[in-house]
């Protein structure tokens, strides 16, 4: 995958002290923008991407040649209207779309970092992306938002910078990664590390790729993004291009073929070590523990207005976990709205064309900006 094509990036020379104790300097942050920053510089929206996302939220991704991961929501006349708002999205540090990550060259060794790369956290990701405000000379964002891991970054941003966003929209997320989700992430990591081509994380320097392990990790994770009813309705027990069972271990069922396909295409656009590092960052995320068991304290200094959105069939970050955020905000008298969207598409609902979600998101943003 050639990531040197049409990538915008800034080199941040301000030292960043990571939660692991290391300090990084002169690191790259890849980003993309949509729309125009107005004269008052009050129409900027910072979008945080999820685990396997990147900075290309809309239009055509110049690397993969596919539509951006949130093209349903971001664009001219869409819920996040780029005719009105200036949208910024950066590839997180630890990622593999041009930002400082394990596939970058370590200047001290002239080799790719691999697993010598420092372990990073959601907090580190957010602190790195905060530099974008200075780069664009933006004093205060109109909004910060994101789904899944993007929602975690949204919460962390408000915690870290309580006066730097007027509106925050965390979608389908949590304030503390659950044991179940840590378990799923560990399954993926072990799949990668069990691949003989992983080479203790040094595979890139040896011209190898742990594609089998990464593919299985993606297959396992992808199941958690869907729902039981959605899977049953779409696939059921339908056979894959055959009239009867073959009594072997080929893909008899359509769902098997679908998962294998998802795994195979994923390895073409994602780095295995980045998968390890980013899932670890998600597992370490715990705003509740950070505030000694009182989530409300994460937001007590902010006047940011919140809209929390969850989905009925999301069992990865269920409505109950989203409501915990609402309860914490209510406890400090924050201005918070909450919407649970009916959908059978599971956790991935926020990435798909779910009209009620897109309408809710667009209406809220439009109303909030009119009061800006």
UniProtKB/Swiss-Prot annotation:
Domain AB hydrolase-1 residue range list: 43-353
Residue numbers annotated as active site: 148 (nucleophile), 314, 347
SUPFAM superfamilies: alpha/beta-Hydrolases (SSF53474)
EC class: transferase
Superkingdom of this protein's organism: Bacteria
Record-listed E.C. numbers: 2.3.1.31
Gene Ontology cellular-component terms listed: cytoplasm
UniProt entry keywords in alphabetical sequence: Acyltransferase, Amino-acid biosynthesis, Cytoplasm, Methionine biosynthesis, Transferase
One GO-annotated biological process of the protein: methionine biosynthetic process
Presence of the UniProt keyword Amino-acid biosynthesis in the record: yes
Record: residues binding substrate: 218, 348
GO molecular-function terms, A-Z: homoserine O-acetyltransferase activity
Record pathway: Amino-acid biosynthesis; L-methionine biosynthesis via de novo pathway; O-acetyl-L-homoserine from L-homoserine: step 1/1
InterPro entries according to UniProt: AB_hydrolase_1 (IPR000073), AB_hydrolase_fold (IPR029058), HAT_MetX-like (IPR008220)
Catalytic activity annotation: L-homoserine + acetyl-CoA = O-acetyl-L-homoserine + CoA
Subcellular location as annotated: Cytoplasm
Family of this protein: Belongs to the AB hydrolase superfamily. MetX family.
Subunit description: Homodimer.
Cross-referenced NCBIfam families: homoserO_Ac_trn, PRK00175.1
Role: Transfers an acetyl group from acetyl-CoA to L-homoserine, forming acetyl-L-homoserine.
UniProt protein name: Homoserine O-acetyltransferase
Annotated source species: Pelagibacter ubique (strain HTCC1062)
């Amino acid at each position: 995958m050639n990531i040197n094509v049409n990538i915008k990036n800034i080199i941040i020379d301000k030292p960043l002290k990571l939660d692991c104790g290391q300090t990084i300097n002169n690191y790259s942050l890849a980003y993309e923008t949509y729309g125009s920053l107005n004269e008052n510089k009050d129409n900027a929206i910072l979008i945080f991407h999820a685990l396997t996302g990147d900075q290309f939220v809309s239009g055509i991704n110049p690397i993969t040649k596919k539509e951006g991961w949130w093209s349903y929501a971001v664009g001219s006349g869409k819920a996040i209207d780029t005719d009105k708002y200036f949208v910024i999205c950066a590839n997180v540090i630890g990622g593999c779309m041009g930002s400082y990550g394990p596939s970058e060259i370590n200047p001290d060794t002239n080799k790719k970092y691999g697993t010598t790369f420092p372990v990073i956290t959601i907090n580190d990701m957010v602190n790195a992306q905060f530099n974008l405000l200075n780069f664009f000379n933006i004093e205060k964002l109109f909004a910060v938002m994101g789904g899944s891991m993007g929602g975690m970054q949204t919460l962390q941003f408000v915690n870290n910078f309580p006066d730097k966003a007027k509106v925050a929209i965390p979608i389908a997320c949590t304030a503390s990664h659950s044991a179940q989700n840590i378990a799923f992430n560990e399954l993926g990591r072990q799949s990668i590390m069990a691949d003989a081509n992983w080479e203790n994380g040094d595979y890139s320097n040896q011209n190898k790729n742990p594609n089998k392990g990464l593919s299985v990790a993606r297959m396992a994770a992808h199941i958690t993004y869907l729902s039981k009813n959605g899977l049953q309705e779409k696939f059921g027990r339908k056979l894959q291009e055959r009239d009867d069972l073959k009594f072997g271990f080929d893909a008899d069922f359509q769902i098997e073929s679908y998962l294998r396909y998802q795994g195979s295409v994923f390895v073409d656009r994602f780095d295995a070590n980045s998968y390890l590092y980013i899932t670890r960052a998600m597992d370490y995320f715990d705003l509740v523990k950070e505030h000694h068991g009182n989530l409300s304290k994460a937001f007590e200094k902010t006047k940011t207005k919140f809209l929390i959105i969850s989905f009925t069939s999301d069992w990865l970050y269920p409505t109950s976990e989203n409501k915990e955020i609402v309860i914490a905000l209510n406890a400090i008298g924050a201005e918070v709205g909450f919407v649970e969207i009916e959908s059978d598409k599971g956790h991935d609902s926020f990435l798909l064309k779910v009209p009620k979600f897109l309408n809710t998101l667009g209406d809220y943003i439009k109303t909030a900006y009119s009061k800006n």
